[in-house]
């Protein structure tokens, strides 16, 4: 999965997919009542990027729905996975459940069109704080209450705080999550970061009793870093320049080992050689 980083304006969806992304990451900011408000990152952000592009969250969802609905004039067949980077750190811990409920309602209405031919992309809820695990339970309960528990088949999870992997496992246990787990590791492109924790996550993914299904590394701009991440065995790379990742994947060393994921590839299944 080549994951376009910080795609917060509708116009950027086409821009990133046309550069080779089959997945995008979108920032979601919340108001003080835990309503998802804008697709917005803010300053500071990655070096070399504009930090302030944004849309109202529900408006962005409507644009995203068009981009991921076959038959729509804006349909992008290659776009199969969306990571919502939930900026829930602005909330109190006891608001996490509400944030999950409100997020589910927004998606149900504006993206899934209440189960009536909405967007088809798989969705990852990426949460920065382990203490906010109730965001997941709130989200799940709401889809159930609203009569669409089947949409949870399209939803996966990530804790993005680079926490100790054992602690991440405990948070999932509290949230009642078994499966659909993506594990991120990374840092802003302005700073270097080694691959030690990525390798730990990959080892968990590949062990018989691991809880992780997929591992992604962020944010990668350089060919050398891309090669390092691929050599470590990641499933996804988040990038400001998706074409760089696509170029490396076409090199002879990688072309036979990796291919770009399509809609037919289940993002919740651990890849087995």
From Swiss-Prot:
Enzyme class: lyase
Subcellular localization: Secreted
Residue ranges of coiled coil: none
Keywords of the record: Cytolysis, Dermonecrotic toxin, Disulfide bond, Hemolysis, Lipid degradation, Lipid metabolism, Lyase, Magnesium, Metal-binding, Secreted, Toxin
Catalytic activity as recorded in UniProt: an N-(acyl)-sphingosylphosphocholine = an N-(acyl)-sphingosyl-1,3-cyclic phosphate + choline; an N-(acyl)-sphingosylphosphoethanolamine = an N-(acyl)-sphingosyl-1,3-cyclic phosphate + ethanolamine; a 1-acyl-sn-glycero-3-phosphocholine = a 1-acyl-sn-glycero-2,3-cyclic phosphate + choline; a 1-acyl-sn-glycero-3-phosphoethanolamine = a 1-acyl-sn-glycero-2,3-cyclic phosphate + ethanolamine
Residues annotated as catalytic: 5, 41
Keyword Metal-binding attached: yes
EC number: 4.6.1.-
Similarity comment: Belongs to the arthropod phospholipase D family. Class II subfamily.
Name of the protein this chain belongs to: Dermonecrotic toxin LdSicTox-alphaIB3aiii
Protein species of origin: Loxosceles deserta
Taxonomic classification: Eukaryota, Metazoa, Ecdysozoa, Arthropoda, Chelicerata
